[in-house]
């Protein structure tokens, strides 16, 4: 081959490679490389979280990790970031350490959390425990994250909180107990959204609702020792699912109007196939309230089993008349024993 021909072949080959790379950049995504990062100390865990990238699996050795632990990187649907460990791997925050990544223009702090996800999507949190913190696990502006098989206990306030428009997340196969040890009225087991009084901090825009929508809570054991509601569904949230959970109301304090397993103030939740037991201190099993006009409506209760020792109802819907055509529904498949007022205060359907 003549030198001029060799040059033509080389130029053509380079051009072909360049076109291939350009095509990959335009229409393809490179697969993330899975890294397994083993950690055994608080310093190692902080470093792994700071360097996290899609596909990482951060594995906790047994032991106690004390400090402010938070994730700010996002995984992807194909390559989530995983934080995993045995129940004997315990995250705590005894010195009220802070995630410094706070949003500008809002008067909020992120201090004292056992674990915090902060604008970090597509995570998996599995297996480990959280104890001795102000709050257990908090998700702020997080989507498509799964919390699976974790254990939260012994915290000052709420156990697990989906907040600041955290959507499409799942809490499953986990346990939450002994919450509200510092502030019983704020010791919810699972907290979805924010009260209207906190929308300026955690809502969408100026005083807009906290749209922590379409979150699922399934197959968990919540209680005993949960001082406030076992699940608090806040006004402004929509279309969540609460299914297949076991509730033990022993320890509900009555502080800050906490007198039921679930307090539903959002819209269009499916609340089904849950089993609850409660002592005489629990007024009702489930309550529906309207804190904001048009909310506390369209919630459907089906297949729930309630065992109570109280003067109230299994399912008490307090503001049905304010819901217009988007009525709450209590199906005939719900059952109750021990509630002196019966199954529900509204008509049972089906």
Predicted ranges, named:
Residues 56-59, 99-102, 188, 193-200, ...:
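Acidic, glycine- and Ser/Thr-rich low-complexity intrinsically disordered tracts
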Residues 70, 98-116, 132-138, 154-163, ...:
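Extracellular beta-strand/beta-solenoid scaffold signature
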Residues 49-56, 74-76:
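Beta-strand repeat architectures
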Residues 44-48:
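Short acidic active-site motifs
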Residues 1-31:
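Secretory targeting and sorting signals
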